[in-house]
């Protein structure tokens, strides 16, 4: 399931590029006006779709050349119980490891579509918290949209500017050493899992029921909190989005390079808190959304 890049937006940007030469030197900014509902869902995110990938790159380049304004994200006006929260940092905060264009499209379009679809799925029903929704996400629509919303909220919260990345807390560092032998070995196993996710999905570091750290991968927008997920059951404290839209603008088909870069922007203070306050006690990590 993928929230595909809005094709109408692509065509607008490409049309604008054709006219841009007539306005050289003129300050121009473009503000995306698509509603989240205009972003469609699909069951796969093929890396081999060159025409779509090229269009994504071309549109992003056009936006940058035209002076696209990458301002801070904003919370979406919710048409239901769930909202799109602000990013906890500017779009460009993760540069050069994750680019501003990717962050803007990923948050404002892809994540927003999951929020919109989660609200549609819960229309007329008593909506649980986003964390509780993960445990009850049985139906495909609820599972995909609710999982996509929770996964992205956790993802954004565990990232930060490289200068603020820090290190795991003593408690988390000890748990990592006990489970994997070393930090480097944990990263190596995580990278293998993330690179091995077929098509679209996530890689997770989390705490199992026996209190030990483990690594697992999930397809689509599943996560280890969900009943019936094809993965190791655990409370995730850190996740990496390996859907194509999370990295293609900058890394194209070089997923391993994206995975390596990811470690430069992990917010270890937040991940440590996720472990100590929640996962190590068997509690799911709550998120605002």
Question: Model regions: which residues?
Answer:
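N-terminal chloroplast transit peptides
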Residues: 1-45
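C-terminal segment of classical bacterial N-terminal signal peptides
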Residues: 14-19, 67-75
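N-terminal secretory signal peptides and thylakoid transit peptides that target proteins
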Residues: 44-62
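C-terminal segment of N-terminal export signals and the immediately downstream linker at the start
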Residues: 53, 70-94
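All-alpha RGS (Regulator of G-protein Signaling) helical domain and cognate RGS-like helical scaffolds
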Residues: 81, 109, 119-128, 132-216
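Short His/Asp/Glu-rich catalytic/ion-coordination signatures at enzyme active sites or charged loops
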Residues: 86-110
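An amphipathic alpha-helical core segment
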Residues: 192-252, 258-266
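N-terminal targeting pre-sequences for secretion and organelle import
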Residues: 253-289
């Amino acid at each position: 399931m993928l929230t595909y890049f809005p094709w109408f937006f692509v065509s607008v940007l490409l049309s604008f590029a054709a006219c841009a030469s007539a306005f050289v030197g003129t300050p121009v900014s473009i503000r995306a006006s698509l509603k989240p509902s205009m972003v469609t869902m699909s069951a796969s995110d093929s890396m081999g779709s060159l025409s779509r990938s090229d269009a994504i790159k071309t549109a992003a380049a056009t936006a940058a050349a035209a002076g696209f304004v990458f301002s801070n994200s904003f919370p979406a006006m919710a048409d239901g119980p769930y909202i799109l929260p602000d990013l906890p940092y500017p779009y460009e905060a993760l540069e050069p490891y994750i680019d501003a264009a990717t962050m803007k499209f990923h948050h404002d379009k892809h994540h927003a579509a999951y929020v919109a679809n989660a609200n549609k799925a819960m229309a007329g029903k008593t909506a649980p918290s986003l964390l509780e929704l993960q445990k009850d996400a049985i139906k495909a629509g609820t599972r995909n949209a609710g999982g996509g919303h929770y996964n992205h909220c956790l993802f954004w919260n565990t990232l930060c500017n490289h200068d603020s990345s820090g290190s795991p807390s003593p408690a988390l560092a000890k748990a990592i050493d006990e489970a994997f032998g070393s930090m480097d070995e944990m990263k190596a196993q995580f990278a293998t899992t993330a690179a091995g996710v077929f098509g679209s999905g996530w890689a997770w570091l989390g705490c199992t029921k026996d209190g030990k750290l483990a690594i697992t991968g999930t397809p689509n927008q599943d996560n280890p909190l969900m009943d019936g997920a094809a993965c190791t059951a655990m409370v995730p404290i850190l996740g990496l989005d390996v859907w194509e839209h999370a990295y293609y603008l900058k890394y194209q088909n070089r997923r391993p390079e994206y995975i390596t870069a990811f470690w430069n922007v992990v917010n270890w203070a937040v991940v440590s808190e996720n472990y100590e306050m929640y996962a190590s006690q068997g509690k799911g990590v709550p998120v605002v959304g």
